[in-house]
Structures are given as C-alpha cells and as structure tokens.
Amino acid sequence: MFVSPPPATSKNQVLQRRPLESTNSNHGFASSLQAIPENTMSGSDNASFQSLPLSMSSSQSTTSSRRENFVNAPPEYTDRARDEIKKRLLASSPSRRSHHSSSMHSASRRSSVAESGSLLSDNASSYQSSIFSAPSTVHTQLTNDSSFSEFPNHKLITRVSLDEALPKTFYDMYSPDILLADPSNILCNGRPKFTKRELLDWDLNDIRSLLIVEKLRPEWGNQLPEVITVGDNMPQFRLQLLPLYSSDETIIATLVHSDLYMEANLDYEFKLTSAKYTVATARKRHEHITGRNEAVMNLSKPEWRNIIENYLLNIAVEAQCRFDFKQRCSEYKKWKLQQSNLKRPDMPPPSIIPRKNSTETKSLLKKALLKNIQLKNPNNNLDELMMRSSAATNQQGKNKVSLSKEEKATIWSQCQAQVYQRLGLDWQPDSVS
C-alpha cells in the first residue's frame, strides 16, 4: 500500500507552531516518516522526502532556541519606547518621516517573514504592530500637525490689491429663489439686477460694500490686510469685518462707521437712524423665518448681505436726493433773480417827473437840489444818473435772493418723488407741512 507524504499546507504550518515536548519526539516523528518503503517511489523523490524531516527538525530547533533567548519587555518600557519613537517622528522632516516609516515597515515585514515558522512569531508581530501597526495613520496625523504648526512660519498677507480683496463668486450671497426665479434678471457677474442702481456714485460704493466680509481668510492671519490702489486720485478702500453672528449694536456700528458714501458727507444722525431702521427690519424678517426671538441673530449669508445692501440703498437714495435738491434750489434762485431783473423802460424816478401843476407845486428847495446835481456832474446827464442808481439797486437785490421754508420743502418733496419713481421704489416722499 502506497502512503504519500503530507502536503505542505497552512494546516501543516500551524502544526509546526505547536510546542513540542522534547527533541526525542522530533526524532520519533522523523523515524516514523522514514519507515515508508523505499521501493514505492523513485530515488529522487525519496531523497527529497528524506531531506524534509531534517529541514523541519533544524527549523524547529532554531525556533526553540529563539524562544528560549527571547525576553518580553515590561509594558512600561514598551509604552516609553513608543512615546520616544513618536517624538522622533514628530521632530523629523516629512521626507525623513516617510522614508523612516517605509523602512521600518519593510523591516517589520522582513522580520515577520523570517520568523514565520517560529513559535513566537505571533508575539513578535503583535509587539511590532503595537508601534508600527498603522504607519499611514501616524503619517496622516503628522501631516496634519505639521501643516498646522508650519503655517505660522509662512509669511502672512498684510497688503492686497482691490481685485484680490473682492469676492470672486456671489452665489452664496442671495437665496436660490432669487437666483433661479428668472435667469434674465441675473447680471453677467452672477448678481441680481437690483444690485445695479442708477444713483450717484453707486458703483464705487457698491464695491465698498463688497469689502465688508463675514470672516477672515486663512492667509490673512488674525487681521485684515490693507487694500492697495494704484494712483493718487483713486478713492479710499478698506476691508471691514462683520461676522454672521453679531449683535444688533455691532451691526449698526459697522454700518455707520463704514466708508459708504463718505464723499456725500451725510450727517451722523441720519446714518445712525438709517442703520437702526435697517437692522430692526431685518430682525422682524429673521424672526418670521426662524419662528423664534434670538438675543443675537445667527444670520445666514443672504440675510447678512441683505442688511448691507438695504443700508446702502437708503443712504444712496438720500445722497442722490440731496444732490438733486441743491441743483434745483440753485436753478430756482436763478429763475427768481431773472424775474426780479426784468428790463423796464428808461424813466426817471417818480419824484423827478414833473406834475401838471409844476409851476405851483415846485418849491425853491427842489430847484436848488436839481441845480446842484447838474453843477457837480456837468458831463453826465440825468438819464445816466438814473441808470447808475438802478444798477446799484439790482446789485443789492441779487445778494438778497433766498428761498422760503415752504419753497425748500416743496423742492425737496419733488426731488424725492422723482428719484423714487425713477428707481421703481414704492417709498413715499416727505409731506410738505
């Protein structure tokens, strides 16, 4: 009966890792395998088969010696070694860390392969895995820590150009209902059409409103950079911070002290009143959306932008109305002056015109006065004297042309109505008292 040798399977490898009682049992196992008749297989097969027990015996004896010489380290030494290795990894550069991790990982792989047949391979692999079990995880953690720790070493941006300071996209500043309602109402820059107004210096101050940001960019650090413009005649620009989670007082103060329409020289009281009204309206709308009354509004980006644009529109309309009012008042004064200086026929003053009974009414005093005037001005006749007197009177009247309160109130109301109608606003002009 032919008996074949057991195949070298994983089961056989597991059996090799089981502890052996003594060296004699190894020889017994080898002798039992050698008892197979030689005539049942060829010579080459027999030679290779006889060499198998010898290699297994030598491998098992080597493993036994390694087991006797191996000493398990106490847990505190293991933890201390692990901490020391981590410290060295953190102190090394990223390239050295990756090279060190790969070399240690390959070394651990070679060690596990060399000791695959040993009885203590499981213990050794578990000891190695406790330190280098997840090199990718350690590398990821080191990368994150190094990126955070190395960022302050980079030079922070303290000066930016106007193009770099302005936002590149605007889709998060407006609700989807506005952006998706009618594509024809969207400008080429992605903003709605109502952000473009035919008002005095609107484009300039719209750019200034876009420089109000809700958060700092990472490359700015903890401070707002300076906006650089080219040219001496360029207007002033600066970045302002207004977080989404801000109190009403912070929002009002930021709007009032902004650079919006600084050239119009609007009075502080008007800007403060306009900012308070804008924030109060936004609070009512926020409470209607959220259904709760918050001490500090946690605004969304569209709500936040809506507050800025409403305040900008209020002061822009006021600046436009005041500009139109000054022009209308100047034009009205010129018209009144022209009406008062209409050309009249060249006639002497009424006191000089002789009456019908001049011979009876003229006194000697009047005759003497007229004679003295003619004697003092022998080269000028009476008509020239009358024209000089009329010119002096007109010059005095020109300096005294003014408008009454009723006239100013009427002109102001007309300017407001024209601006509101031109912009399509349903606002009501101030009533004339």
From Swiss-Prot:
Q: Name one GO biological process term.
A: signal transduction
Endpoints of the signal sequence: none
**What InterPro entries has UniProt attached to this entry?**
Std1/Mth1
Q: Could you tell me where the Polar residues compositional bias lies?
A: 9-47
Q: Where is this region: Disordered?
A: 1-117
**Residue ranges with Low complexity bias:** 48-64
Q: What is this protein called?
A: Protein MTH1
The organism that produces this protein has a lineage beginning with: Eukaryota, Fungi, Dikarya, Ascomycota, Saccharomycotina
Record's family? To yeast STD1/MSN3.
* Biased composition annotated in UniProt, kind: Basic and acidic residues: 77-87
Whose protein is this, by species? Saccharomyces cerevisiae (strain ATCC 204508 / S288c)
